[in-house]
């Protein structure tokens, strides 16, 4: 089967046998491991980042299940918010709130409901194909009444504690979406941009040529200037430059004015407070404004030390103006455009107006300087529009009141990577502000606060039942908790007035942050289930969720219960393309996970995501990464299983009938390695180091395939069911069974296919393998590791001189660094001889008899020191006697007499030492040994090499004919006399290497023509 057939077959098998459900039911009564699914939005297609997140979530859940825990996995859908509204606006070809109102809010809401599940089937199919086991039949949905009712209960509880309030503040605002954003939403949308900063001239009233220099990075705010701020504690100067006098901070004078100025007077900031000035523009007139005030937020780290204040677009500006009782003005509308009062720019988007503002300043003579500067600026995380800071009324949750508790809760959380706790996430908590919870939009959980039209009294119902109790008329039985339906419900106020619901819906992050409670409709039902499922043992999402879901979970839980909602967090890195760039459709470098699954299989995709680098690191990812995962790991384990199953079928091996305790050294070694790997992997996975575990497994798969199975082939090929063959079958059966259990969380399809064929039931209802300490033989593993290293080194020597392994060589000389290594290698000399195809492996104490040592002057180091003598020294070094070479190697220094009679001392760094094998010997220098391979070829060695190449040619031809591996055949050869002579002399070797009856020299019809070491011959197999 190819991967697509296998995975399709396994999915059907799991469904038919209820394997996912059984894996949970089998753990009933066991300790619970609590898993939370961060809800995706189903109005967009899944991307590579989703594949990473879902793979790691599935991995952890499978591993913990196999480790004995019951892991409930409830899926979820995030259904509210701006992304849905924007998608619907596109579908309807409308834009903005005015168009929505014209279209009809109720109709718009119905369209939103339809939109949120447009790609639900694609998400389900993707989830299924990826092998992510999560309960998608009973997911929580943030749009459902029970979910919203639980969210209302949390909000009402917060309101009861006076932590939910209405205020007028400067908040981040998206002019495209026409709504404010919370600080954690803002943190997700920063981009590096180039903008213009301006130093403007504010003329002091009643002074002909005296100006205060005010600096701003937002020139578009200058038409709404109300005040200038100085720091009363700072020193300022009045500096004459040309015919004009400028006021600027003393410490910034050189930076702002350059050197061509004269200080007329030094003044304190306090002295400047109260000075009246003329604003650069005269579009607005103020009753109380356009004078200098003192503010401690003004610094001398940049600008002029004097800050222009526009209370509508800066939090510090707003607070300072409010504190002084100065006029509040706003000349920008809700769409981010200048109002008519700014006549030259009316209707123009303010962020596009900086150049026009600067031109107007220059024309009026009030521009001192303009500069380009690069900085990070917040953009809407949903529509990509540059945000404005905008003074408006809104609803806020006083998260600052529970800041310390949130910080304490965070300290109890185990973060992966650890630095996130006190770094990125901890810093965000340190700088948190009250949560701007209200959104002036349509599709979302309605904020459940009713306000009296007359006395401003507020009521917040905890439930639908309370909503009915408060309402002044009957509430429909099927009331839907969305706009515009709940907006029709009014309350009677004690003062005699009417209470209407405030117009806002809530931040969608509060929706998803409430999921620990709302997914089970807490506190209205499922108390026992909720108590078992809170807090989470782990939450897993991308690193950007430090300012998203991770934050909202912690904030909501701390506000509502005082407790942390999770014990540990796995914060995943980004998926990048092979060049290290972020993937995006617009760049054309995005990879579709569904297409990767179709091309390479889900197991290959999963292995590539899990084994390449730690989950919290950014990953460079490409088709090649997935292709290599398939070829190096998935295909290798399948080939090992195919080898086992083919010969087990031929020999009718039955583990229950034929199993034996007998073992060869090779069997003991692979079982020792298996248990060492089980130990390593278990330790890694218990520490959530999934990648380290994968690397241990990958190494073992290679050892199993390229060492154990390859070295054991003759045992499986032997006739009959002897004890040695039983031992090989028994060992490989055990290794494959436990290896597939180890690999099941990584590659669930292949692992289950193999395990089910071996054991009769799914690997996913089995236990993760336990280490058998008694099976671990550290000395045997160390000895065999030495053997493998020697073989690898010797093979590299063959490659250097282009001599194939089929060509036997006379000798491999090994010079080990220590006696223990030599002892281990000597025990397996015959294995090394077979693998390297040498007649003899010999051990020496040193390399003196096999190496030539060459020395030459190190010109970059010795040249400057020797000067004109460098030429003489070069000749001397290159002609050192063996005694001189030995003396230098021992002492690390040598005195050299030059031709002119002078003497120089050469140190270790002055001479380059190169060691080479003597002619006919190839040198390999490893960390623990030196190898010397005799590459001289005698005629007898060449003849044997010819025979081995002949054997390879016959094996290749057998495969082409698709002959059963166990079928014995007769071989007919038609070649020259010399070839026939050689083949006859090595008849025993040919019979050892092939399953044949005989080799006969005769011409047959339709013989296959092959070339063996430049000799042409015809082959026929019958």
Curated annotation (Swiss-Prot):
Reaction(s) catalysed by this chain's protein: tRNA(Ile) + L-isoleucine + ATP = L-isoleucyl-tRNA(Ile) + AMP + diphosphate
The EC number(s) this enzyme carries: 6.1.1.5
Alphabetic keyword roster: Aminoacyl-tRNA synthetase, ATP-binding, Cytoplasm, Ligase, Metal-binding, Nucleotide-binding, Protein biosynthesis, Zinc
Subcellular location as annotated: Cytoplasm
Enzyme class at the top of the EC tree: ligase
Source lineage: Bacteria, Bacillati, Bacillota, Bacilli, Bacillales
Statement: the UniProt record of this protein carries the keyword DNA-binding: no
Name of the molecule in the record: Isoleucine--tRNA ligase 2
Cellular component per GO, a single term: cytoplasm
Short name of any one Pfam family annotated for the protein: tRNA-synt_1
Function: Catalyzes the attachment of isoleucine to tRNA(Ile). As IleRS can inadvertently accommodate and process structurally similar amino acids such as valine, to avoid such errors it has two additional distinct tRNA(Ile)-dependent editing activities. One activity is designated as 'pretransfer' editing and involves the hydrolysis of activated Val-AMP. The other activity is designated 'posttransfer' editing and involves deacylation of mischarged Val-tRNA(Ile).
Family: Belongs to the class-I aminoacyl-tRNA synthetase family. IleS type 2 subfamily.
Motif ('KMSKS' region): 582-586
Cofactor list: Zn(2+)
Molecular function (Gene Ontology), one example: isoleucine-tRNA ligase activity
Keyword Nucleotide-binding in record: yes
Main location: cytoplasm
Taxonomic source organism: Oceanobacillus iheyensis (strain DSM 14371 / CIP 107618 / JCM 11309 / KCTC 3954 / HTE831)
Location of the motif 'HIGH' region: 40-50
Binding positions for ATP per the UniProt entry: 585
